Structures are given as structure tokens and as C-alpha cells.
């Protein structure tokens, strides 16, 4: 039997993003996945990684979460514009040098 669910809770304590490894601070909203697929599992993804994954379709076409897909995407982005900024944000764990969070990536206006 396979079961999974997703929610967007507000962090009450610090968590670690399973995609970029950055700290999800208390008060931040994040994606939390839970499932049972032979074994029980949980998945936490910061709002930045979730937005980038959805905007730039970073997936293998399945339901699997794989940080290697993000690494491949970020290292393969060329040119300029919002996608390059998002890749740079991911590579810096969505933090500026001073420690402030980058803005959450947004889909470019058509």
C-alpha cells in the first residue's frame, strides 16, 4: 500500500530543507510531505525550492524528490534572467552573504 500527503505548515522550530539543505527558520512556511511506501518517510522543502521546482519543472516526471535533479538544473542554466537568478539562489542556499533570505522565485510575467 502506498500513501502520501502534502501540507504547508508554518515552522514552529528549525528544520532542514531536503533539497537545498538550508535551515528553514521558525515562522517560515514550507512544504511537508509524508508517506508510506513500504517504509514511512517525511520530506521538507523550503518555499524557495518548491517555487523553483514548480516554475522550472525540475522533476524526473515522477513523484520522487531528488536533490540531484536540482544540482543538475542549477549547474546547467545558461544565459541571463530569472532562471539564472533562481539557480544562483539555489546554489547559495537562498541566502545573501549577510544571511538574509532571497526573495521567493516567481514566474516571469508573460
Q: Residue ranges of each PLM-predicted region?
A:
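Short metal-binding segments enriched for Cys and/or His
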Residues: 42-64
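Short, flexible, mixed-charge glycine/proline-rich loop motifs
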Residues: 2-14, 35-40
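Conserved short hydrophobic patches within well-ordered secondary structure
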Residues: 20, 30-31, 52-53
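Short, intrinsically disordered terminal segments enriched in charged and Pro/Gly residues
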Residues: 1-8, 58-110
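Short Cys/His-rich "knuckle" micro-motifs
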Residues: 26-30, 56-59
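Ordered hydrophobic segments in well-structured contexts
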Residues: 4, 30-32, 41-46, 71, ...
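Short cysteine-rich clusters marking metal-coordination/redox-active sites
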Residues: 17-20, 46
Amino acid at each position: 500500500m502506498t500513501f502520501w500527503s502534502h501540507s504547508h505548515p508554518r515552522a514552529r522550530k528549525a528544520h532542514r530543507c531536503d533539497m537545498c539543505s538550508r535551515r528553514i527558520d521558525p515562522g517560515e512556511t514550507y512544504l511537508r510531505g509524508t508517506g508510506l511506501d513500504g517504509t514511512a518517510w517525511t520530506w521538507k522543502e523550503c518555499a524557495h525550492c518548491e517555487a523553483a521546482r514548480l516554475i522550472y519543472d525540475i522533476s524526473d516526471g515522477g513523484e520522487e524528490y531528488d536533490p540531484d535533479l536540482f544540482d543538475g538544473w542549477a549547474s546547467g542554466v545558461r544565459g541571463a534572467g530569472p532562471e539564472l537568478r533562481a539557480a544562483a539562489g539555489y546554489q547559495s542556499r537562498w541566502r545573501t552573504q549577510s544571511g538574509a533570505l532571497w526573495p521567493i522565485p516567481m514566474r516571469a510575467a508573460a
